[in-house]
Amino acid sequence: MILYEDPIENETTIAYISTKTPIIPSICDVLVTRGTPSFDETGLKHNSVVKLNKIATIKTHFIAGLLGTADEVLQAEVNKALDACLKFAPQE
């Protein structure tokens, strides 16, 4: 999942997506499952988990293609989980 694109450095920050969904997700996991409104837009074919404790920055040219998009609901879930997982300080 693309978290951030830096056009100046030509780099993209991504989070790992796996089809091995945990029985009990951690605070760093965001489940993307069939039957939820967000699932269809993602282009994923199976229930999946976005692992926000597995983040990498890669050169954009290594990205072969995109499957779909994250709707506003999924983006909000990812942002909330990122805050919890990385323990960002609350904004004042």
Q: Where are the model-predicted features located?
A:
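Conserved functional hotspots at enzyme active or ligand-binding sites that engage polyanionic ligands
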Residues: 2-92
